[in-house]
Amino acid sequence: MASRTTPSRSTPSRSTPSGSSSGGRTRVGKYELGRTLGEGTFAKVKFARNVENGDNVAIKVIDKEKVLKNKMIAQIKREISTMKLIKHPNVIRMFEVMASKTKIYFVLEFVTGGELFDKISSNGRLKEDEARKYFQQLINAVDYCHSRGVYHRDLKPENLLLDANGALKVSDFGLSALPQQVREDGLLHTTCGTPNYVAPEVINNKGYDGAKADLWSCGVILFVLMAGYLPFEDSNLTSLYKKIFKAEFTCPPWFSASAKKLIKRILDPNPATRITFAEVIENEWFKKGYKAPKFENADVSLDDVDAIFDDSGESKNLVVERREEGLKTPVTMNAFELISTSQGLNLGSLFEKQMGLVKRKTRFTSKSSANEIVTKIEAAAAPMGFDVKTNNYKMKLTGEKSGRKGQLAVATEVFQVAPSLYMVEMRKSGGDTLEFHKFYKNLTTGLKDIVWKTIDEEKEEGTDGGGTNGAMANRTIAKQST
């Protein structure tokens, strides 16, 4: 049965606090927070805009209490220091760190090209030259970070983003590894990452070299890019681990002989005999068409590293999160947010049309009222076996049954994009991606009386002006500029 965690949406809204933005938006320092881009048990990533200069960023919001509870202060300071010093063109940049009394905010580079994951499906493998280009950028970025003592430990296509020019950007470098510890033997001992991409020595949990484990994951990614499917796959976790331990996989016939040879040397189950990053970089297959990265020099300040745990109130990095409670209406998307979700202005849409992708989020538009949309979603999801929690115009749908990758969890939010038009964004926050799309298809079928257009229908209308959202964005820009 659907349950709600906050008062009814008819509750009168409070007056907007001084310094907060209108329409229920949250303001943190000089940044106005927008929609949620991704979330996990440890943090949420929000789209944000610098109100002083208009720059767009992504802000990772971490619960300070969890950091303190897990005695991770020294570790998080070390990770932040390293991340701020990393200035590689293929790694997401960290610009600054802020903190409130309850949260830590990482201000990160925002890229608009989508995930590399979105370019891959069972029928959408990349050509070898294109796969090699991304692999070269990946190896360069990971090797650079290793040279500065930072290991990823959860490399997978979902953590590899693309900028507007199609260049690779590795995300969550170092930060994804915060809960892990190095013991006295100098080896990592925490099993982490996505099982299909994890090295056998990590699964063994006997201690492992972070660089060798990351290289294994890079090898799996290369295989996926070229094959369109995973080298190690099994619905039974024990059977999957056995395949990984023995490196039981077969390269498809379209792999070149030199690519097969390199992948087999990377996916060596014995870390002692596995090829190294230095050897990969000197490999003839790898060097074909290689372009060295171009670095930018910039001054870096580490003053904010200690300041984020300074609660004296004297630190300039201590910010106050201001927001409006009890919204009467959904948040209204501004012009840039419309553009950033627009199919016509997002490079990822070009790949979607060609690849038949499996994405972790989707959306539809509706001309029904916001309250009716929320009520109908609650009514449609409950019979499908989902617990529904509603907080104003944000919803969390959690499956009662456990699927292939645990319980399916779907974060949903209703945005107003025009006086009588709303956009409903649904994002997988837990569970299996394919199960998410099956759920979404069944849900929207049950919502056909309120769904105006789905994302697929928008694409069918073409990318000129970005379809519904692109046209809406253009009209919004024109209105704001007058």
Swiss-Prot record:
Classification via SMART domains: S_TKc
Top-tier EC class: transferase
Residues carrying Phosphothreonine: 190
Region of interest (Activation loop), ranges: 172-201
Domain NAF residues, every copy: 328-352
Needed cofactors: Mn(2+)
Protein name listed in UniProt: CBL-interacting serine/threonine-protein kinase 23
Native source species: Arabidopsis thaliana (Mouse-ear cress)
